Design a protein with these regions (language model features):
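Conserved kinase catalytic-core helix
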Residues: 1-24
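Context-gated lysine
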Residues: 2, 14, 49, 59, ...
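Detector for Asparagine
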Residues: 16, 29, 54, 77, ...
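Alpha-helix capping and helix-coil boundary motifs
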Residues: 17, 51-52, 101-104
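Catalytic activation segment of kinase domains across protein kinase-like and atypical kinase folds
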Residues: 19-80
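Regulatory N- and C-terminal appendages and interdomain linkers associated
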Residues: 37, 93, 98-165
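A conserved mid-domain beta-alpha-beta active-site/ligand-binding segment of alpha/beta enzyme cores
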Residues: 62-114
Length: 165
């Protein structure tokens, strides 16, 4: 998790606070090669405002026309906040780590809280928001799961991909 946390904070530090650009630092979007972290993601780049990304998600959905009429774009934020908000990014990374390694969830939480506490890149307010989200292993909310399913954007685990020896 540390390498992903570091990369996420570097990303947040490099963008201008007035720039609305998304980043999805979930664990499964990374690989480690020769001690370096490599980012890969097949989702379209989030070089857009969150509202525009919400519209794109609906447009890509097989039910986009119907969903656009019944789901306010702001509700899609339940999915896309994790691409734009530092606290939600942390929660997403930690939640992903805990879901992939449930037996280590307590260790992951302890490490994550210590990382946040020691970070000089995070403001006091950032830390408070993150600590509120890391009281227990983060879980995906039912609304998050529903919106992802309805938009056809459920994600596929890539940990079962065969590795040639």
């Amino acid at each position: 998790c540390k390498m992903v946390f570091d990369e996420m904070l570097q990303f947040r530090a490099k963008i201008n606070s007035r720039t609305d650009i998304g980043f999805h630092p979930t664990l499964r979007n990374y690989s480690v090669h020769e001690g370096e972290l490599w980012f890969f993601d097949t989702f379209p780049p989030m070089l857009m405002k969150q509202r525009d990304l919400n519209g794109l998600i609906l447009k890509m959905s097989p039910y986009g026309g119907i969903l656009k009429k019944i789901i306010p774009l702001m509700l899609i934020n339940k999915v896309t906040d994790e691409y734009y908000r530092t606290d939600k990014m942390f929660s997403g990374i930690v939640g992903s780590c805990c879901r992939l390694r449930p037996d280590d969830a307590d260790k992951i939480l302890t490490f994550s809280r210590e990382y946040v506490n020691q970070s000089v890149s995070l403001t006091g307010e950032d830390k408070k928001r993150i600590f509120r989200l890391l009281k227990k292993p983060p879980r995906l909310s039912k609304i998050w799961i529903l919106i992802r399913k309805l938009s056809g954007n459920t994600g596929k685990p890539n940990i079962n991909t065969p590795i040639s020896a």
